[in-house]
């Protein structure tokens, strides 16, 4: 019995000693670290093994739209939803091709009427047409899609583009990256507003190229009108808030100035009578306004704009500060809303592409809209221009140019597809027929007070009809009403014009 008791004491002592060893903080930490590291390594090895198995079982795995196979329709990928891109989408034969559109906006903007939305003459939806209405196959066909995304990289050798979804600054949504393989690629990504490297333009000016630009201008204009009536505001600050400055004397700048003067004379004078004598419009241009129009029409436009209260200033903007801009002669011009409309230039995406460029930095193309250095890549619209080797001058960045290029390219694709050249690398030796030829159909611009300019000459030096006045305004409205993309939008535009004529412009700040 004594032997058994001694053995029990020894066992308790040993067990207690071992327990004390493992309860030692240093010993416990080292052990747990070792075990944790071992477990993590085992988990990592397991995950890697699973990935290896998946990759082995799925050799064709593709993050996006994989290359088309035999028996499937060839895929035409269109980057952009402007005039050129949407005209391709509209004209392409979807019984031959699947179409995919990638763009940060899901609609086309009818830009000739965009200035009218800034002051409430038209509603914003009247100038926007959804892509799925332009090409119904996008919402119906299993192989056709629209993706809300931007193209981040172009791999022409492998016939694929890398895209990233647009989340519009949402903190809860992370951009998703994916790839799209194509048989034919159409670069119709447009251009961006030219700032000429002037300090402060991007931070302080508003451009007029998209619907959200028009919305911003409208909200800014109505906000300044309301703030100018607040008691106690200084006289200088009131004049600054009510001074609308437009930089750029092209058709967009002149049309916006005309719409703005109509808004002031008809609506502001009735509904903001306390400040009706303080609101002003200034149009700044470095050269002659409407330089592409006939001289007689230009002088008529200047006369009418002056009658409408628009002040014309010739000068070059050197710097834009938060509440004033500085001209080349040192003149300081205070402003409330500042609208920048000085033309367009290549976008950052176009500049990043390793393609030959035209003299203006746009994607270089031949007479068939092809990018000569790569296979199955075409460029149309404002992002493209003829290479010097073609001997052709670069076409102007106009809606009618982009639309007609898009129509030509859609017809070219349809012919190629019917001849068996729709797939990637299948049209290398194919005769493409007649090259694209542009014929200018003329220019039109409204200048306010039921007046407009119509210049139907093929060039500034050519002969043709040019007219101005009320009849021109009627022609301008009739032409654009018939050119609006769909019957739905034509109905909207006609109703908006009628309600504005009867009840005046909507001044709600929404």
Curated annotation (Swiss-Prot):
Compartments, as annotated in UniProt: Mitochondrion inner membrane; Peroxisome
Ligand binding (FAD): 75-105
GO CC field: mitochondrial inner membrane; mitochondrial matrix; mitochondrion; peroxisome
Source superkingdom: Eukaryota
One Pfam family in the UniProt entry: NDH2_C
GO MF term set: NADH dehydrogenase activity; NADH:ubiquinone reductase (non-electrogenic) activity; NADPH dehydrogenase activity; oxidoreductase activity
Cofactor note: Binds 1 FAD per subunit.
Keyword presence, Mitochondrion: yes
Principal location: mitochondrion
GO BP annotations listed: cellular response to light stimulus
Residue numbers covered by motif Microbody targeting signal: 501-510
Enzyme class: oxidoreductase
Keyword set includes DNA-binding: no
Induction: Follows a circadian regulation; up-regulated in a diurnal manner. Up-regulated by high-light.
Disruption phenotype: No visible phenotype.
Keywords, comma-separated and alphabetical: FAD, Flavoprotein, Membrane, Mitochondrion, Mitochondrion inner membrane, NAD, NADP, Oxidoreductase, Peroxisome, Transit peptide
Positions that bind NAD(+): 242-278
Tissue: Expressed in seedlings, cotyledons, young leaves, stems and flowers and, to a lower extent, in roots and buds.
UniProt-listed Enzyme Commission number(s): 1.6.5.9
Reaction catalysed by this enzyme: a quinone + NADH + H(+) = a quinol + NAD(+); a ubiquinone + NADH + H(+) = a ubiquinol + NAD(+)
The organelle targeting sequence, given as a residue range: 1-48
Cofactor: FAD
Topological category with respect to the lipid bilayer: Peripheral membrane protein
Family: Belongs to the NADH dehydrogenase family.
Task performed by this protein: Alternative NADH-ubiquinone oxidoreductase which catalyzes the oxidation of mitochondrial NADH does not translocate protons across the inner mitochondrial membrane.
This protein's name: Internal alternative NAD(P)H-ubiquinone oxidoreductase A1, mitochondrial
Species the sequence originates in: Arabidopsis thaliana
Gene from which this protein is expressed: NDA1
């Amino acid at each position: 019995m004594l032997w058994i008791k001694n053995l029990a004491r020894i066992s308790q002592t040993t067990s207690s000693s071992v327990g004390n060893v493992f309860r030692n903080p240093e010993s416990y930490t080292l052990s747990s670290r070792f075990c944790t590291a071992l477990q993590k390594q085992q988990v990592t090895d397991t995950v890697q093994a699973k990935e290896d198995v998946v990759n082995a079982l799925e050799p064709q795995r593709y993050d996006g739209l994989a290359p088309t196979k035999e028996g499937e329709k060839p895929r035409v990928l269109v980057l952009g939803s402007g005039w050129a891109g949407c005209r391709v989408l509209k004209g392409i034969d979807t019984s031959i091709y699947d179409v995919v559109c990638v763009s940060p906006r899901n609609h086309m903007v009818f830009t000739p009427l965009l200035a009218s939305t800034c002051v409430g003459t038209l509603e914003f939806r009247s100038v926007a047409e959804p892509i799925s209405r332009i090409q119904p196959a996008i919402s119906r066909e299993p192989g056709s899609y629209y993706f809300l995304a931007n193209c981040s990289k172009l791999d022409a050798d492998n016939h694929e583009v890398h895209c990233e979804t647009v989340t519009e600054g949402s903190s809860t949504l992370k951009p998703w990256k994916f790839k799209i393989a194509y048989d034919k690629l159409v670069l119709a990504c447009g251009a961006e507003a030219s700032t000429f490297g002037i300090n402060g333009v991007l931070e302080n000016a508003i451009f007029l190229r998209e619907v959200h630009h028009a919305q911003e201008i409208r909200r800014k204009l109505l906000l300044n009108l309301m703030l100018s009536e607040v008691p106690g505001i200084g006289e200088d600050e009131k004049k600054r808030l009510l001074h609308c400055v437009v930089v750029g004397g092209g058709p967009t700048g002149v049309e916006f100035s005309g719409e703005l003067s109509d808004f002031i004379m008809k609506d502001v004078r009735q509904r903001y009578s306390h400040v009706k004598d303080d609101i002003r419009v200034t149009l700044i241009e470095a050269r002659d306004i409407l330089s592409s129009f006939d001289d007689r029409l230009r002088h008529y436009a200047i006369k009418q704009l002056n009658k409408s209260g628009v002040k014309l200033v010739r000068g070059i903007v050197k710097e834009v500060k938060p509440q004033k801009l500085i001209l080349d002669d040192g003149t300081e011009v205070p402003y409330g809303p500042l609208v920048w409309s000085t033309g367009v230039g290549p976008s950052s995406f176009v500049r990043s592409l390793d393609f030959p460029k035209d003299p203006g930095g746009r994607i270089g193309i031949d007479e068939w809209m092809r990018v000569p250095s790569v296979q199955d890549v075409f460029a149309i619209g404002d992002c493209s221009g003829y290479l010097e080797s073609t001997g052709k001058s670069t076409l102007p960045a106009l809606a009618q140019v982009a639309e007609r290029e898009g129509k030509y390219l859609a017809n070219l694709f349809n012919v190629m597809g019917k001849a068996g050249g729709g797939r990637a690398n299948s049209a290398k030796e194919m005769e493409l027929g007649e090259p694209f030829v542009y014929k200018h159909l003329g220019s039109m611009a409204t200048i306010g007070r039921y007046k407009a300019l119509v210049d139907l000459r093929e060039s500034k030096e050519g002969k043709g009809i040019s007219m101005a006045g009320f009849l021109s305004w009627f022609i301008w409205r009739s032409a654009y009403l018939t050119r609006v993309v769909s019957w739905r939008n034509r109905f909207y535009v006609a109703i908006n014009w009628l309600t504005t004529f009867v009840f005046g412009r909507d001044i709600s700040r929404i």
